[in-house]
Amino acid sequence: VHLTAEEKSAVTSLWGKVNVDEVGGEALGRLLVVYPWTQRYFDSFGDLSTPDAVMGNPKVKAHGKKVLNSFSEGLKNLDNLKGTFAKLSELHCDKLHVDPENFKLLGNVLVCVLAHHFGKEFTPQVQAAYQKVVAGVANALAHKYH
């Protein structure tokens, strides 16, 4: 991902304030509610029958945290996202057979959640930088697909 020094600074300074537990669960939960077909990858998560069930599901929250911890690793390696996400790309492609389009959806949902959490601090410039990052991460995760 090609970010200016200003964009990198905006992304990293905001990310330092992110509560990964809270935002991760909310982002994954919203993905599962807004795009219900994504639930098929989470059969083992139990009750996902209503928005409240999804948002309160401890497995959704735990996996959301895991997803954002990986995203944090990506932020530390913006110049090598494909390398950073190579193993996860392989896992999601070969073993889990996740539609790579879902990575883009989750990235966009994450941007919405960050906007919701940070309000005025999430300026259009910050959003533009985050859109570049989530697109880069989605692209890196889709890299191993044939």
UniProtKB/Swiss-Prot annotation:
InterPro entries documented for this protein: Globin (IPR000971), Globin-like_sf (IPR009050), Globin/Proto (IPR012292), Hemoglobin_b (IPR002337), Hemoglobin_oxygen_transport (IPR050056)
Keywords: Acetylation, Heme, Iron, Metal-binding, Oxygen transport, Phosphoprotein, S-nitrosylation, Transport
UniProt xrefs under Pfam families: Globin
Gene3D superfamilies: Globins (1.10.490.10)
PROSITE patterns reported in the protein's UniProt record: GLOBIN
Binding site for heme b: 63, 92
Domain Globin: 2-146
Phosphoserine, modified sites: 44
GO terms of biological process kind: hydrogen peroxide catabolic process
Sequence positions bearing N6-acetyllysine: 59, 82, 144
CC per GO annotation: blood microparticle; haptoglobin-hemoglobin complex; hemoglobin complex
One MF annotation (Gene Ontology) recorded for this entry: haptoglobin binding
Modified residues (S-nitrosocysteine): 93
Family: Belongs to the globin family.
Function description: Involved in oxygen transport from the lung to the various peripheral tissues.
Assembly information from the UniProt record: Heterotetramer of two alpha chains and two beta chains.
Protein name: Hemoglobin subunit beta
Organism of origin: Meles meles
